[in-house]
UniProtKB/Swiss-Prot annotation:
The gene is argD. This is Acetylornithine aminotransferase. Pfam families: Aminotran_3. GO terms for cellular component: cytoplasm. It comes from Prochlorococcus marinus (strain SARG / CCMP1375 / SS120). Its EC number is 2.6.1.11. Coiled coil: none annotated.
């Protein structure tokens, strides 16, 4: 075997360091110079043996942490039983997970796929068909929020209210218009302008908490307004719960914080506990799909659904909703103390449960990326949500002592900035 010339190998640059080793991976990620080789609970180890407290959890996916004993045992057994068959046949594991999701939510039926973007694509198709069948709209429009994020596939990207993700991928999919988050007047003005002459709007798509957009928490009055407005105008209310769902906020579903039920909502990330799965959950009134309207080769496979059901039951059995609520409050209080200690840099705590962000003041020269880099040196993994928000999404199993460690190491980052 002949080594490939270095000129053909991509390299990943990193602020303040030399490029990492050549790679044959397509250059789509600005990777950090950190090679993770092992995980256990809320902790990760790199190839040198250095230990890190993980406040990223695979970006809100590893709900039970890493190498969970129960999940590992169940999935090992499932691998020896059956991994995948086609949706041409009934899949018991899929039906079991669907039943659990329906029993625990406002939905009546479930479609399974492999990711959040896929789930949102399914929701977009659902809304378009609903608009055509129920409202007689030939070219339905979906209203989405500014600063939202719904995925990288083309329709989900087009529904995303952040142009920085869309640049270079035009023409975008048509049929999306944008309103200001938590602004009922913005929604009403946009809707009325679009529907001056004929019905054009099929649905409103929104995140209860904007994750990539900066951990912006929805306002209860605004979500009451959305539900009422959609009812009055016979349009669907769709929630993107890809990041907020499965207990991340201290409640199983983000919509529970508002006492507002969507007509359909999407899940992924935390549902699989680190394994690929997504879902669209639909109420009966929005169940417009027929056989052949949508499909997924791998969606709902036995392995992924066994992972999802195990995660779901462990969240219940270990009382992780209460743990998320308590540890989220502990983390919030600690972050507020950081703001008090570094008021020239920090502004506010955003989010809820274990989906929290620490906002940096706009006039500060500090960026979230700088804190991410400093945190790595302190043995802590955090991520950004834009340039001015430090995001923390630890596993739902995180302990009181581990939250204390997180805060101590984060404080060390800011202390170094002052020195």
């Amino acid at each position: 075997m002949v080594d490939a010339p270095h000129s053909k190998c991509g390299t990943f640059g990193f602020v303040g360091s030399s490029p990492t080793a050549p790679t044959f991976l397509l250059d789509t990620y600005k990777r950090l110079p950190l090679k993770i080789v092992k995980g256990n609970g809320c902790w990760l180890w790199d190839e040198t043996g250095k230990k890190y407290l993980d406040a990223v959890a695979g970006i809100a996916t590893c709900s039970l942490g890493h190498s969970d004993k129960k999940l590992s045992k169940v999935l090992s057994q499932q691998l020896r039983k059956i991994q995948h068959v086609s949706n041409l046949y009934r899949i018991p594991e899929q039906e079991d997970l669907a039943q659990w999701l329906v029993n625990q939510s406002c939905a009546d039926s479930v479609f399974f796929c492999n990711s959040g973007a896929e789930a949102n694509e399914a929701a977009i198709k659902l809304a378009r068909k609903y608009g055509q069948i129920k409202r007689g709209i030939k070219r339905p429009i979906i209203l989405s929020a500014k600063s939202s994020f719904h995925g990288r596939t083309l329709a989900a990207l087009s529904a995303t209210g952040q142009t920085k993700y869309q640049k270079g991928f035009e023409p975008l999919v048509e049929g999306f218009e944008f309103f200001s988050f938590n602004d009922s007047n913005s929604v009403q003005d946009l809707y009325e302008n679009l529907e001056k002459d004929e019905p054009r709007v099929a649905a409103i798509l929104i995140e209860p908490i904007q994750g990539e957009g900066g951990l912006n928490l929805g306002d209860q009055k605004f979500f009451y307004f959305l539900r009422d407005y959609c009812n009055k105008n016979n349009i669907l209310l769709l929630f993107d719960e890809v990041q907020s769902g499965m207990g991340r906020t201290g409640k199983l579903w983000g919509y529970e914080h508002f006492n507002v039920e969507p007509d359909a909502f999407t899940l992924a990330k935390g549902l699989g506990g680190g394994h690929s799965i997504g879902a669209l959950l639909v109420k009966e009134n929005a169940s417009i799909f027929e056989p052949g309207d949508h499909a997924s080769t791998f969606g709902g496979n036995p392995f992924a659904c066994k992972a999802g059901l195990t995660v779901a039951k462990e969240i219940q059995n270990r009382n992780l909703l209460e743990n998320t609520y308590c540890r989220g409050n502990q983390l919030r209080e600690g972050l507020q103390k950081l703001i008090n200690n570094y008021p020239h840099h920090l502004e506010e705590v955003r989010g809820i449960g274990l989906m929290l962000g620490l906002a940096i003041k706009k006039n500060s020269n500090l960026t979230s990326q700088k804190i991410v880099e400093l945190a790595i040196k302190e043995g802590l993994l955090v991520i950004g949500a834009g340039e001015k928000v430090i995001r923390m999404l630890p596993p739902l199993i995180i302990t009181k002592r581990e939250i204390e460690t997180l805060l101590t190491r984060l404080n060390a980052c800011f202390r170094k900035l002052n020195n």
